Amino acid sequence: MRHANLALDLHIAEKRYGARTVLRDVGIGLRQGEVVSLIGASGCGKSSFLSIASGLDRDFRGEIKLHGQPLDGVHRDIGFIFQEPRLFPWLTVAQNVAFDSDNDAAAQKLSTRLLTEVGLQEQAQSLPKQLSGGQAQRAAIARGLFSHPRVLLLDEPFSAVDAFTRMKLQDLLLKVARQRELTVLLVTHDIDEALYLSDRIILLDGVGSPAVTEFRPPPRPRGRGDVALAALKSSIIDRLHAVHAI
């Protein structure tokens, strides 16, 4: 998919770590407002791809375009949420959210609004050690939204929380993405999560041919466990076995 109006357009000709090639001829384009999940076996290059997409990793051959313009490094239009919340333990939740700012009145107001949006207004003055795992990840989501990004990258953000909290965070992500028309690229090992959240699912085989295989869940609205998703899940698992011999 190569269109001029893509929010994020990536072509990675090659990414190497020493003598080992982890990505070769991988091309993925994301439309504005689209939620895309990136799946694949461990070691297939998902995290490397996400690091390149964020602008953090420039040591590769290829090209990234953000809203049609070359991306040459970290950009405030791209937010990043990690598997672990990575909150500064000596700062309050509100200060963590507004960390990358002058912490002036406008920043504090925005921090308060974002914490309200993710349901943490009562914990604004708490320290990270006082939060549950789910609350800490909510704070990380608020921090990821602080710069008003148009693209949000997430690296297995819900894998460290319990199943009930995971579902609530998934619904929060969908709500925020719709309200802000965010483009979302989510790395996950959870096929059910990908099926529930995504407009498209991309199975990555970093050095394979083809390097990507695309799946499209049925249109929304759809719920967890919908019968229509079962056949697609089976197809994805079959393809995973074929690609990665797992």
Model-found features: residue ranges?
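Short, polar/charged, Gly/Pro-enriched helix-capping and turn/loop motifs at alpha-helix termini
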Residues: T183, G208, V243-I246
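Conserved beta-strand-loop-alpha-helix hinge in the C-terminal portion
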Residues: V207-S235
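Active-site/binding-pocket entry motifs
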Residues: L87, R220-P221, A242
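Extended, non-globular alpha-helical segments
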Residues: A160-A163, A231-I246
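ABC family nucleotide-binding domain
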Residues: H3-E181, L185-D192, L197, L203
